[in-house]
């Protein structure tokens, strides 16, 4: 599995601000979107382009356009919604697919409860977004769902990832690509990433 920890100074600075225990919901939400936008830039660096001719102000001009597969953004409810706008800033024409998977706080197992995928999902590249890759259960369940629906081109964008989650994802889906702002130390006994961001969903939605 391709694993990319993006060490760009802008990303690391913004992520550092997000780790502040006293950060406001508004600021956390803004930074989540900003980091997501920067991760998208990295994750789409290998998209193929083609040369087309358009009519410019002084006559015909050749420009580069993205070619090939169309893109769908796949936020995992609910925290993934906090990353969606950051991706769409760079790819405004992307279709949105929504998957609902929550983690049972006692068993730490994923529980799927909702899906609404973009049309022709089998023809699209999926950018799956979720702030935290902790145990990997929710992400694996989402990718299972996408693959069962015919999607074969999948990239994962997360703000922070735990080694345990990376290992589980790689074992389940070695063909996907993972882009993260940070590979953190470990999971604690409650399944939270250390140092992590706390509960990203609560911080994005203001439901502490």
Swiss-Prot record:
Keywords linked to the UniProt accession: Allosteric enzyme, Glycosyltransferase, GTP-binding, Magnesium, Nucleotide-binding, Transferase
Pathway in which the depicted protein is active: Pyrimidine metabolism; UMP biosynthesis via salvage pathway; UMP from uracil: step 1/1
Binding site for uracil: 193, 198-200
EC number: 2.4.2.9
GO biological-process terms attached to the record: UMP salvage; uracil salvage
Cofactor(s) the protein needs: Mg(2+)
Similarity annotation: Belongs to the UPRTase family.
Residues annotated as binding 5-phospho-alpha-D-ribose 1-diphosphate: 78, 103, 130-138, 199
Biological role stated in the UniProt entry: Catalyzes the conversion of uracil and 5-phospho-alpha-D-ribose 1-diphosphate (PRPP) to UMP and diphosphate.
Cofactor note: Binds 1 Mg(2+) ion per subunit. The magnesium is bound as Mg-PRPP.
Regulation: Allosterically activated by GTP.
Keyword presence, Aminoacyl-tRNA synthetase: no
Domain of life: Bacteria
Protein name: Uracil phosphoribosyltransferase
Molecular function GO labels: GTP binding; magnesium ion binding; uracil phosphoribosyltransferase activity
This protein's record includes keyword Nucleotide-binding: yes
């Amino acid at each position: 599995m391709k694993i990319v920890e993006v060490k760009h100074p802008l990303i690391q600075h913004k992520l550092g601000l997000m780790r502040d225990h006293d950060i406001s919901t508004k600021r956390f939400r803004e930074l989540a979107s900003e980091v997501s936008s920067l991760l998208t830039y990295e994750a789409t660096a290998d998209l193929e382009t083609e040369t087309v001719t358009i009519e410019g102000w002084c006559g015909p001009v050749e420009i580069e356009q993205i070619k090939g597969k169309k893109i769908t953004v796949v936020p995992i409810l609910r925290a993934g919604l906090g990353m969606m706008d950051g991706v769409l800033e760079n790819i405004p024409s992307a279709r949105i697919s929504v998957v609902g998977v929550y983690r049972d706080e006692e068993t730490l197992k994923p529980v799927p409860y909702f899906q609404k995928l973009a049309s022709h999902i089998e023809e699209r590249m999926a950018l799956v977004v979720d702030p935290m890759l902790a145990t990997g259960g929710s992400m694996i369940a989402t990718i299972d769902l996408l693959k069962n629906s015919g999607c074969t081109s999948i990239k994962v964008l997360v703000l922070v990832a735990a080694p345990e989650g990376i290992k589980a994802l790689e074992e389940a889906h070695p063909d996907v690509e993972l882009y993260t702002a940070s590979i953190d130390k470990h999971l604690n006994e409650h399944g939270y990433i250390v140092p992590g961001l706390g509960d990203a969903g609560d911080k994005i939605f203001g439901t502490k």
